[in-house]
Structure formats: C-alpha cells, structure tokens
A protein has these predicted regions:
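Acidic-residue sensor for enzyme active/binding pockets
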Residues: 27, 34, 44
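Loop-to-transmembrane-helix entry motif
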Residues: 33, 37, 137-138, 143-147
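Short loop segments at secondary-structure junctions
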Residues: 35, 52-54, 79
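Membrane-embedded multi-pass helical conduit in multi-pass membrane proteins
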Residues: 141-176
Length: 176
C-alpha cells in the first residue's frame, strides 16, 4: 500500500509481570485501533520499518529516548500513514531486575511526554485529518492525566490536613 510509510510489529514480551501484560494488551489494542482510524503516533522501536524518503531527519531529536515515536509521528506528518501490523510479532525480553524495569518505564514515559509536547503545533492541524485528534488524545493521556492525578493527590492531602486541623481545639492547647 503506497499510503503507508511506516509499519511496526506487536511485541510478545518474555518475563513480563502480570500488571504489565494487561497494559501491553491494552497498548497494542489502542495502536491497532489508531492504525485503522488513520495512524498511530507510537510504535515499538524494536521492530519497525519505514520508507526513508518519508522521513525528515532534520526534525528528529537525536538525544530523545522516544526515537521510535519521533519516527512514526514524523512519517505521518509528512503525509504517509503509520500502522501497527496485527500479523507481525517479535519477541522482546523484559529486564530481569525490578529496578531496571522501572527505570526503563520511566525513561520511556518521559520521552513520550517530551515528544508529545514538541508536537503540540500539530494537535489541531487540519491537514493531518484524523491523526490530529489521535495526537491530542495521546497528549491528554500522557501529559494531562498524570498532572491531574498529582493535583488530586495534593488536594486529598490538603483536605485531610484541613479536617485534621479543624478537630484541634487551639483555645485549650498549651505548649509544655
């Protein structure tokens, strides 16, 4: 298909924890859905191919740790679709140590957040068609949701602190 500029495979991870398995299944399902609607901005870098003519190398941030997402988004912005092929799979090994596993996840999340922030000029680009809403949705999921969760946590702590202070009778309190 000449409209496709980049294709990614679905990972089958060996050694993943139970909670990650559910996340990976959901992640792949979303990528496949985005591919059917238009394109996905995220692919697994371990197994992806793209047309070199569809990639603007000058637009890539070489120090970014989300290079696969950069490539996928760059190809789509330059007019070709990006899909995750449901029939293509590859084997990926999860880090054995929990600390290394967590470090990998945090680096990936930070890289995707930075990448999405750099792409904000495309959130409402009509030329991108259905891809612009996909980009906005991913930005909301990866940038706004964590901020809202932190805000909710702080509000909860503040509320309980106020309730706790309201219960103290300061008129009869003495320092000893």
């Amino acid at each position: 298909d000449k409209s496709i500029g980049c294709v990614g495979a679905t990972p089958k991870r060996i050694g993943q924890r139970i909670e990650e398995e559910g996340h990976r299944t959901l992640f792949s399902m979303v990528r496949h859905l985005e591919s059917k609607i238009d394109s996905t901005p995220f692919l697994e870098g371990s197994c992806m191919v793209w047309r070199t003519s569809s990639l603007d190398l000058e637009a890539l941030h070489v120090t970014s740790n989300a290079d696969d997402a950069q490539i996928a988004t760059n190809v789509r912005i330059h007019g070709l679709r990006v899909i995750q092929d449901s029939d293509a799979h590859f084997i990926d090994h999860a880090p054995l140590e929990r600390k290394e596993h967590s470090r990998q996840k945090v680096r990936r999340a930070q890289g995707l957040q930075r990448h999405l922030l750099r792409q904000r000029e495309h959130y409402y680009n009509r030329r991108l068609g259905r891809f612009a809403p996909i980009l906005r949705q991913e930005a909301a999921l990866h940038i706004l949701t964590p901020l809202l969760l932190v805000g909710a946590f702080i509000a909860t702590l503040a509320r309980w602190a106020l309730i706790g202070f309201a219960e103290i009778d300061f008129t009869n309190a003495t320092l000893t």
